[in-house]
């Protein structure tokens, strides 16, 4: 029987340093080494979320990490989720259920923080009773000392869990010595003792050139450098931060099926398109440029955290007109979740669930009307699209109800295994669905691409589940080969 290990927390010198991906790697490594790990992030801020088997909502990163660990995802892995709806306001999701909208000042003030702290601590305790080790992830930088008293996710959480903290730094952005040294020196005396190691992430070039730098950093901070993880390009792990959109392709190319994802201001769940991005038959790109939309064979309208605001912006910047023009010219248009709502005749928000806009006309491509509601639908679903016999999987996360225009007969796109219906189907080039993950199903992808068969240069079909498992193993091998795992296990065994 394996000896129990201390929890480990991957804390960061800043945002987007690679904490989530390294956490996924460690989850897979511990699984490979015979442990039963589970991920934990007390508070996550993201628009990419996922539905648990119980029909509750967590951050997508923790769902990915759970998949890497080989365990079902659960709200205890991410008890507090913030979903931004504007620059200043977020929907607060506690233990998988929305409890209201808060602006930043309301959320970070001290009143009510202890109740939230008790909730995230209780979630950790439940998780730690079922799994070992717990692979914890901090949020952003651990150096925001002005937020220390109300912090729920970084060093106070590590202290509660009695976790060994590993500081992750991104050398690719420069200033790694200052960021590591500053992050350590800004901690309290007790918190400094909790930081047991440093991981230098995203290194480019010959690692031997940094050997002297490792010694300098260890001498400066008094903390061992556990590893230098090289930058990689050939490993593909789903990421939830919107910053990754900055690195995605933005233009059409010749010789493949061009699929344009409309780049909404409040785009959510862009992981819906990861499977298509790996399909060699197509070229998928993100754009809100009307000229690039005109070059697409298929236009996908993605999910949105603020559908009415995005609809208003699409009309203002000409994208709405470009989509309608493309549709008239024979381009396929499909909407997912908020994108499905955008394609309807009207969107109503009588109670101001999303904000101040109460009603707008939709794109008018589907004979449906959406009414925003405070009750959120969150569930995993099995379904069959149209007359297809293959069972597909996906999940729903939305706060609107979409119904047919009165007096109009609508063909549902999907029939759910529980007897329900989803979406609207006009023809093979015009449809919408509430189901996230619909584009992870090979049968549906083949149906979507079918009208463009003459453009296909490659007929290789990707088994996405097998592909993801291979990527987790590749990531684990990459991190394992550049990390001092014996020292990490020694630290987590309490022998540091």
Where do the language-model regions lie?
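A conserved active-site-flanking secondary-structure segment within enzyme catalytic domains
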Residues: 344-394, 399-402
